[in-house]
Amino acid sequence: MAKKTVAAKKRNVKVDANGQLHVHSSFNNIIVSLANSEGQIISWSSAGKMGFRGSKKNTPYAAQMAAQDCAKIAFDLGLRKVKAYVKGPGNGRESAIRTIHGAGIEVTEIIDVTPLPHNGCRPPKRRRV
């Protein structure tokens, strides 16, 4: 006789009009997350999730597509205003924020939260092409 499996219960996230936008832009990928005011994730997307591979993942167009996918879900759930938190040195940071604004979600402020070392780890060596 087969064991009964319990399906994982989907989390209920309370969505109000205000929220947070987190854009994590590394040298290899871009991750866009929209959260409510408590910080619980409403929707997320990344360039890799949208089907981009390799060096195409860190392009402004890939960031635009990821932000569009993320914003559509959150807008339908009722999110209207966000504070944008941008982290990382990669391309497409501004592109993602512009796309969110274009989708009907108002960006009230943009905060750069890129971690800066106080001379921590040695950076990777320069590429010789």
Curated annotation (Swiss-Prot):
Gene3D superfamilies found in the cross-reference section: Ribosomal protein S11
Pfam families referenced in this protein's UniProt entry, alphabetically: Ribosomal_S11
Protein name per Swiss-Prot or TrEMBL: Small ribosomal subunit protein uS11
Function: Located on the platform of the 30S subunit, it bridges several disparate RNA helices of the 16S rRNA. Forms part of the Shine-Dalgarno cleft in the 70S ribosome.
GO cellular component entries: ribonucleoprotein complex; ribosome
Quaternary state and interactors: Part of the 30S ribosomal subunit. Interacts with proteins S7 and S18. Binds to IF-3.
Keyword terms: Ribonucleoprotein, Ribosomal protein, RNA-binding, rRNA-binding
Keyword RNA-binding assigned: yes
Any single GO BP term: translation
Keyword Ribonucleoprotein recorded: yes
HAMAP family: Ribosomal_uS11
Top-level taxon of origin: Bacteria
One MF term in the entry's GO annotations: rRNA binding
Recorded name of the encoding gene: rpsK
Family in the record: Belongs to the universal ribosomal protein uS11 family.
Regions that span the bilayer: none
